[in-house]
From Swiss-Prot:
Classification of source organism: Eukaryota, Metazoa, Ecdysozoa, Arthropoda, Hexapoda
Superkingdom of this protein's organism: Eukaryota
Assembly behavior: Interacts with the Ste20-like MAP kinase msn.
The species this protein was found in: Drosophila melanogaster
GO molecular function: cysteine-type endopeptidase inhibitor activity involved in apoptotic process
Other facts: The name 'sigmar' is an abbreviation for salivary glands marred which describes the mutant phenotype.
Protein name: Protein salivary glands marred
């Protein structure tokens, strides 16, 4: 019987997630996101576009990142996560930071790139994130998470991005600088 009770808070939360996800363009996101994070998203867009050769696919990936971040932010701001989910969030944060540190190291130190290690790190971050948000997001949103992590864990992208003579070397340098700056300020 309790499932049929009208809950305006739940409807309000769903409306917030829906409205914000529809507004998730790079320009709108810049009003919610600091300069370093915006720069990181712009550089990730450039990397995606270079790798795929497809502007629409690159835009979709970045929009998916923005939508995911906004929805998680709405859930967090509205205290929707249980204590257990908050503990899982700390685990995700550690795993994601390890992934970021690996990216920095593999870029800065030639011939240290370890594809299986990085793919495992990305996959573990994906699983950790989904374990937190699964009860709160739709299958479509969970699919967005998979699409983003699957793209950035793709062998061809990673192998090309971390080659010392990579055609992505310049944009990877900017991404690494953005990650370093964001980690220093605690933005990611």
């Amino acid at each position: 019987m309790a499932d049929n009770v009208f809950k305006s808070h739940d409807i309000g939360l769903r409306a917030q997630k829906k409205i914000l996800s529809r507004m998730a363009t790079k320009n709108i996101a810049k009003t919610f996101i600091d300069g370093t994070t915006a720069s990181l998203l712009d550089n990730l867009y450039r990397l995606c576009k270079m790798h795929t050769g497809n502007k629409a696919k690159a835009e979709k990936l970045i929009k998916n990142i923005i939508k995911i971040v906004i929805k998680i932010g709405v859930l967090h701001r509205n205290n929707q996560f249980s204590d257990e989910e908050l503990q899982k969030a700390e685990l995700f944060k550690r795993k994601f930071q390890n992934t970021q540190l690996s990216i920095i190291s593999f870029y800065e130190v030639d011939f240290t790139f370890d594809l299986p290690y990085l793919q495992k790190s990305i996959a573990e971050s994906q699983v950790a994130l989904k374990s937190i948000v699964q009860p709160h997001l739709t299958e479509k949103s969970l699919g967005r998470i998979d699409e983003v992590f699957d793209f950035f864990g793709e062998e061809a992208l990673l192998e090309t991005a971390f080659r010392p003579d990579s055609p992505y070397r310049e944009v990877m340098g900017k991404i690494v600088a953005d990650i370093n700056a964001a980690m220093e300020t605690g933005d990611i």
